[in-house]
Design a protein with these regions (language model features):
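Transmembrane alpha-helix boundary/hinge residues in polytopic small-molecule transporters
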Residues: 15-16, 20, 115, 131, ...
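Structural signature of transmembrane alpha-helices in multi-pass secondary transporters
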Residues: 6, 37-45, 122, 154, ...
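Small-residue-rich segments within alpha-helical transmembrane domains of MFS-like 12-TM solute carriers
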Residues: 7-15, 123-127, 234-242
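Helix-loop junctions on the cytosolic side of multi-pass membrane transporters
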Residues: 19-23, 61, 65-95, 169-172, ...
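Juxtamembrane cytosolic amphipathic helices that cap and anchor the N-termini
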Residues: 97-122, 221-225
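A gly/Pro-rich, aromatic-decorated transmembrane alpha-helix motif that marks the paired
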Residues: 43-55, 273-282
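C-terminal transmembrane bundle of multi-pass solute transporters/carriers
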Residues: 100, 107, 132-133, 137-323
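Cytoplasmic helix-loop-helix junction between adjacent transmembrane helices
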Residues: 2-45, 49
Length: 323
C-alpha cells in the first residue's frame, strides 16, 4: 500500500514539475532545465541507494526512514511557500473529458506523437536489466556485485551526459537529434548482446576461463565491455530524453502540456515493463544473448525507417516548435 501511494505521488509530482517548466523559464533555457533534471535523476540513482545502504547498516531501518521523512517534509514546506502561478489559458477541470482532449490533440500532433513512439521502441527492445542476475551468476560472473555495477553504469552515463550537455543547447534539429541518439542507444544494446554471445560461446567451447558467483571469479574484460555498453546506453538515452522533453514542453500549448506530460509519463513507465517481458520471454525461449542482439538491430532499423517516413519529425526545428 505504501509503495503504491509513493509511486502515485511520485508520478503526479514528476508530471506537474515537468509541465510548469516552460512557464518558469525562457525557451532557450528549457534544454538546460531538462539536462539539470537528468543530473538530479542520475544522482538519485547512484548516491541515493548508496547513502541508504550506509544508513541502514549503521543506524537501522527506523532511523533511515526518519531521515527520509525529514527530507520529504523539508521539500513539501519549500513547495507550499512558492508563489501561486497564474492559471494557464485553455485549462479545464480534470476528468475523462480532459484526458480525451489530450489524446485527440496527440492524434493531430505528429512530432510529439513520434517522440513517444521512438521512445517506446527503445524501451521495448533495449532494456536488458532483467538479464543482469543471470549474467552475474553464470555468464560474466561476479554475482550481485556485477548486477550492481551494470545497473549503476547506466545511471552514471545518464549523469555524465547531463553534466556535459552544454552543446545540446546549440542543436536546433531536435527530431533528427532524437533519431541519432536512439540509434546510438541501439548500437550499445547490440554491443551488450554481442558481449554476452561471445562469453556464452567461449564458455561452451572452453575458450575462456569459467566464471563464478563471487566477484573474484568475474571475467574482467566482459564486465568492462558490458559496463561500457550500459554507460553508453545511459548517456545516449539521456541525450534523447533532453531533446524529447524539450520538444514536448515547447511545442505543446499551455492548456495541453499537463495532459501530454501525463501520457509521456505512462510511456516512460510502461515501455520498460513491456521491454522486461520481451527480454524475459526471448531469453527463456532462445538464449540470454538473443534479446539484446535482436533488440539492438530492431532499434537501429526501426528508428531509421520511422525518422525517414515522418518527414516533419526529421525536419523539426526548435526555433519554430510545432506539435
Amino acid at each position: 500500500m505504501l509503495a503504491t501511494l509513493g509511486s502515485v505521488a511520485a508520478t503526479v509530482q514528476m508530471t506537474t514539475r515537468s509541465a510548469v517548466t516552460p512557464r518558469l523559464l525562457p525557451g532557450e533555457l528549457v534544454p538546460a532545465a531538462s539536462a539539470l533534471n537528468g543530473i538530479s535523476f542520475g544522482v538519485q540513482l547512484t548516491l541515493g541507494p548508496a547513502l541508504a545502504g550506509v544508513l541502514v547498516a549503521s543506524v537501522g531501518f527506523g532511523w533511515t526512514y526518519l531521515v527520509d521523512v525529514v527530507l520529504f517534509t523539508t521539500m513539501f514546506l519549500g513547495i507550499v511557500t512558492l508563489p501561486k502561478m497564474a492559471k494557464a489559458e485553455g485549462v479545464e477541470r480534470p476528468g475523462w473529458k480532459s484526458l480525451k482532449q489530450g489524446i485527440d490533440f496527440l492524434r493531430n500532433a505528429p512530432n510529439i506523437r513520434m517522440s513517444f513512439i521512438v521512445d517506446i521502441v527503445a524501451m521495448t527492445f533495449g532494456r536488458p536489466h532483467v538479464l543482469f542476475p543471470a549474467l552475474g551468476a553464470g555468464v560474466i560472473g561476479g554475482g550481485a556485485v556485477t548486477v550492481g555495477i551494470l545497473t549503476a553504469a547506466m545511471a552514471v552515463g545518464t549523469f555524465l551526459a547531463s553534466l556535459f550537455s552544454g552543446p545540446v543547447g546549440h542543436v536546433h534539429r531536435h527530431g533528427l537529434a532524437v533519431g541519432r541518439a536512439i540509434t546510438v542507444y541501439g548500437g550499445f544494446v547490440l554491443l551488450l548482446g554481442l558481449t554476452v554471445l561471445g562469453m556464452q560461446v567461449g564458455l561452451a567451447n572452453g575458450l575462456v576461463a569459467d566464471v563464478g558467483k563471487t566477484f573474484p571469479d568475474v571475467n574482467w574484460i566482459a564486465l568492462g565491455v558490458a559496463a561500457f555498453a550500459m554507460l553508453g546506453m545511459g548517456a545516449s538515452d539521456e541525450i534523447s530524453a533532453i531533446f524529447r522533453s524539450t520538444m514536448l514542453l515547447m511545442a505543446a500549448p499551455d492548456g495541453m502540456r499537463g495532459r501530454l506530460q501525463g501520457i509521456f509519463t505512462v510511456v516512460v513507465a510502461g515501455g520498460p515493463r513491456i521491454g522486461d517481458l520481451y527480454i524475459g520471454v526471448f531469453a527463456t525461449l532462445v538464449a540470454l544473448w538473443f534479446p539484446p542482439v535482436l533488440g539492438g538491430i530492431v532499434i537501429i532499423g526501426l528508428i531509421a525507417v520511422l525518422v525517414r517516413v515522418q518527414r516533419t519529425f526529421r525536419a523539426y526545428d526548435a526555433r519554430t516548435p510545432t506539435p
